Amino acid sequence: SFPTRRSSDLTKATIKGLILDLLQDPHYIGSQIEPIKLILANTFHLYLRPGSKIVQAAGGLHQFENWKDGLILTDSGGFQVFSLGLANQKFNDQKHTHKVGIKLTEEGVKFRSPYDGSKHIFTPENVVDTQCELGSDIMMVLDVCSPAGSDKKTIEKHIAMTHRRAKRAFEHFKPKYEEARGVLFPIVQGGSYLDLRTQSAEYLSQFAWDGIAIGGVSVGESRELIEQVKIGRAHV
């Protein structure tokens, strides 16, 4: 176990301009600050560049970025694809021609690389495989993140899909569980609706073998709503 922080440091599998040892050195970060034991690496960007198999061939993320004594959490990449959808809407509103081609289906989420326009699909299964290749300690399932301001009916639809994806992800991960370096977390959704978050947490508890994550926060809603969700999270 380890103490969690309000935020985790996000990397692209590298720390620039800083010796990694300093992140855990109290003389550098200050004696009042808990040494950093967990960093987050971005699955979406690592999948596209340099590619999870290249990271795997280099010995996994811990060897790749020389983070040998700490833990690494990887996200599913779903939020980044969600963000691409918002970017697509923004560009369309400004009458630009930039297209990122986001399409949410039962199979997964289809998108185009923002780097070269190539087509890709994230599924509950291949996202687990990608994170296993990266050598993550804490992995996340592919969920559906509802945009801020979504009505309750839309969020309920997204929660149902999130739950189906979690079931698929854990069925796929179960045979790998003993050999995998890391553990897999389901992600609770529900927007700002405490009743929906409670329902989501109750359903996903069957998959909380090692932990559970809270998703769909800080996606454009007001600070007041974020605080409400934080208070509700403690209740859930």
Q: What spans do the regions from the language model cover?
A:
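Non-catalytic, usually N-terminal nucleic-acid engagement modules in DNA/RNA processing proteins
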Residues: 5-177
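Intervening/peripheral non-core polypeptide segments
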Residues: 31, 231-236
